[in-house]
Structures are given as structure tokens and as C-alpha cells.
Amino acid sequence: WNLAEEGVWRTRAFLVKPVAETFGVLQPVEDTVFWGVQYEDRREAWMLVDVYYFGINGRGETGQRSFGTYGIRYFRSQQVDQIDYNGETVFQVGSRNNMDHFAYFQHFEVGYTLGGFLTPRFSALYDYASGTQDPTSGKSGTFDTLFGARRAELNPSSICGPFFRSNISSPGLRVDLHTSREVDMMV
């Protein structure tokens, strides 16, 4: 479902039964439902805003999950010779594997893009994601990316995916280079 005034605001909602790929065959994930709603506001170029809620209920590879994910993202699009920024705050509340679940994730980034050869963008960023403090406490605090990508700010992390957005505090500096429309590099 999608309702919008193009270029000004948009509201999207969905309700799905996730599938998993096993040996090239898509199979429904038993007893799992995933839903959400997102509002995007594009009225002010200096402050673009996304507000969202995602819910999940069911059993998957990571165990029983029944919680809501609430988030807000505010950003300014990257443009040559301008400062841009990107901030996101996310909270999760509910239950996971029959334990109370409360987790959170924060992302802050500020950057500047130069014109000319390779269009370099220099940025400073910081990610923080909660983790479970005491596994015997009966409480879950590990942030769950739901069905999100691993790449994000930690760069491509290969097939084995050693990095997840949980239990991390990660400051960083990054340079993005755009060699062509098809190729981007980041250091």
C-alpha cells in the first residue's frame, strides 16, 4: 500500500509472510508474519525525515521473535560542495526467545562532497547498537536487524558476514570515490 503527494510526502504499509531460499527454492518461513508502516517527509531539503514502525511475530533462524521496531531517520541528501548528514535512532520492544526484549541502534554521520575528479566524499560516522549485557538475566538486549543487509557502514563483509549491528560501538572516518556511474569505492 502506497499513498503519496509525490516529492512532498509518502506513506507506505505492508504485511508479508517472509520466505527463505533453500537450494534455490523459496519456502515460506513457518508461523512468521512481518509488517510495517513508514512515513517520509520531503518538504524541507535541509531536513528530510523518515518515521517508521516494523513488527515481526514468529519463529525463524534466530529463534522466536515478537517485537516492534520504532525508528526515525533525518538526513540531508549528498550534493557537491555541501555538508550533508544522516542520523537514525531505532528502538525495539517486545519479546525474543521468551525473554523481555529491549534493544536500540544509533547512527550518526556528517560528510562533505567535493566536485571534480572522482567526486570524493569525506565523512565521519558513529554507530552504536545494544547487546545483551548478561545472557543469564532473562532479558534480551541484542539489536536485531530483522531482514536488513549486513553491509551498511561496516563496508562489504563477505559471504560469512562477520559484522552485525549488535553490541557495537563503532566510530569511523570514510572516503567515498565515484569512479563512474557503475563503480563506487570506499576507504
Predicted region positions:
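Transmembrane beta-strands of outer-membrane beta-barrel pores
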Residues: 15-19, 53-59, 78, 89-95, ...
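Surface-exposed extracellular loop regions of Gram-negative outer-membrane beta-barrel proteins
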Residues: 4-8, 65-109
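Repeated loop/turn-to-beta-strand initiation elements of outer-membrane beta-barrel proteins
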Residues: 6-13, 43-50, 78-85, 118-122, ...
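Membrane-embedded beta-strands of outer-membrane beta-barrel proteins
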Residues: 1, 37-39, 72-74, 108-110, ...
